[in-house]
């Protein structure tokens, strides 16, 4: 409890140390975003994942939306770029979970916040596992929006299942 009290007092004190840290983070983020801006604004065809995220961030009513992502690549792609501008507007979570987790998460968010626009990002691999969750959203009258990032790949984490990757191309979703 004492530690929490000290943290609260420090946060409320408008400490110059905290201001310096915030300024330093802002400078680093600005430089980092400069490197990524070409991807977020790219006109390449097909659209890259970062362009989709960049367009959503520019057009979405951030204060009246709740956004999440699915496991794997979509999480890694959106996490650095989505600005959570108000509490509970972005539901981010740990390293990974099962594919298809974003849709039920958004169903719950929509039922709890019916006036909010609820948006889920997921990959094409996860979308293929989510038919019953879409039916649940319809049945429960929980209108959500899902953006499917059609990148034709899954199992994006390097290092796992090397033989299956090399021999069978298990990360490629080609329909073959």
Task: List each model region and its residues.
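Terminal amphipathic helices with adjacent charged low-complexity linkers/tails
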Residues: 1-25
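Alpha-helix C-cap/termination motif
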Residues: 14, 59-62, 112, 140
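Thiamine diphosphate
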Residues: 1-8, 66, 76-176
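Charged, low-complexity, helix-prone segments enriched in Lys/Glu/Asp/Gln
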Residues: 17, 21-40, 109, 151-163
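Active-site diphosphate/adenylate-binding microenvironment
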Residues: 27-109
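Serine/threonine-rich low-complexity intrinsically disordered regions
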Residues: 3, 15-17, 35, 41, ...
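Poly-acidic low-complexity segments
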Residues: 1-3, 20, 48, 61, ...
């Amino acid at each position: 409890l004492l530690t929490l009290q000290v943290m609260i007092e420090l946060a409320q004190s408008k400490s110059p140390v905290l201001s310096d840290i915030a300024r330093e983070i802002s400078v680093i983020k600005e430089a980092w975003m400069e490197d990524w801006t070409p991807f977020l604004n790219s006109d390449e065809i097909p659209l890259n994942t970062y362009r989709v995220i960049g367009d959503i961030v520019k057009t979405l009513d951030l204060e009246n939306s709740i956004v999440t992502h699915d496991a794997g690549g979509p999480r890694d792609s959106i996490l650095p770029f989505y600005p959570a501008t108000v509490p509970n507007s972005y539901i981010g979570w740990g390293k990974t979970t099962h594919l298809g987790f974003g849709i039920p998460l958004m169903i719950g968010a929509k039922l709890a916040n019916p006036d909010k626009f609820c948006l889920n990002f997921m990959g094409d691999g996860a979308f293929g596992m989510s038919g019953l969750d879409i039916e649940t959203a319809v049945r429960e009258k929980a209108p959500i929006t899902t953006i499917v990032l059609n990148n034709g790949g899954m199992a994006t984490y390097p290092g796992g299942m090397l033989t299956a990757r090399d021999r069978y191309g298990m990360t490629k979703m080609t329909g073959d």
